[in-house]
Amino acid sequence: MPVLTMKQLLEAGVHFGHQTRRWNPKMAEYIFTERNGIYIIDLQKTVKKMDEAYEFVKSQVAEGKIVLFVGTKKQAQETIKEEAERCGMFYINQRWLGGLLTNFRTIKTRIERLKELQRMEEDGTFEVLPKKEVNLLRKEKERLLKYLGGIQNMPRIPDILYIVDPRKERNAVLEARKLGIPIVAIVDTNCDPDEIDYVIPGNDDAIRAVKLITSKIADAVIEGREGEQFTPATTSSQEVDKASEQVEIAADDIDEE
């Protein structure tokens, strides 16, 4: 029983890839067809790859592994934060700071500074300092919170990265690969799948598509940590055939626009 059905993927627009002129040839195996200059992703491949990614995340989290959710593009920022918090994991949704993985010791010093400023605000220290100094400290705190708030309680370097758009998050991919950290990612038709350990072929630009896939990764985390059972999707062979027809219809609709 698949984690996501073809119908769910279609409704969220997961099948829409990028314009053909912006493709990466290595994604050819995940492409169903092309219509009006836009690639249509093979959702049967997405269903299979989603299942593999889900099982990997679930099994690793059950062993105590940490997942870092990464997505800094506007379409992903809110979802990355919401889903990481929902499953009790960590996230980066503003800007990837260089060395976040490869120089984590330095990043930790900035996190400690953030926590120090938070303590100062909570224990009344700000109230006895000059107003001008307090304003500067508050600005520093807000800046650190913006970029590091999602990892301020992360105890160590993550064991897994979940990424929305590895092409945009190039630095995160490079650091993870350098350290041998496995990557699970939504990979659109303009990305290089060879850099990703668990490829989920799909639209990384549509908010609904990003939300659908990311929420399932969060579900895998929760199931791995707490043993919660999420109702899996069921897809019959008839549904697969029908969904394939709908993909072709959707592709034809592009021609007509």
Curated annotation (Swiss-Prot):
The keyword Membrane does not apply. Residues 229-257 are annotated as: Disordered. GO terms for cellular component: cytosolic small ribosomal subunit. SUPFAM superfamilies: Ribosomal protein S2 (SSF52313). Signal peptide: none annotated. InterPro entries: Ribosomal_uS2 (IPR001865), Ribosomal_uS2_bac/mit/plastid (IPR005706), Ribosomal_uS2_CS (IPR018130), Ribosomal_uS2_flav_dom_sf (IPR023591). GO terms for molecular function: structural constituent of ribosome. Belongs to the universal ribosomal protein uS2 family. This is Small ribosomal subunit protein uS2. It comes from Caldicellulosiruptor bescii (strain ATCC BAA-1888 / DSM 6725 / KCTC 15123 / Z-1320) (Anaerocellum thermophilum).
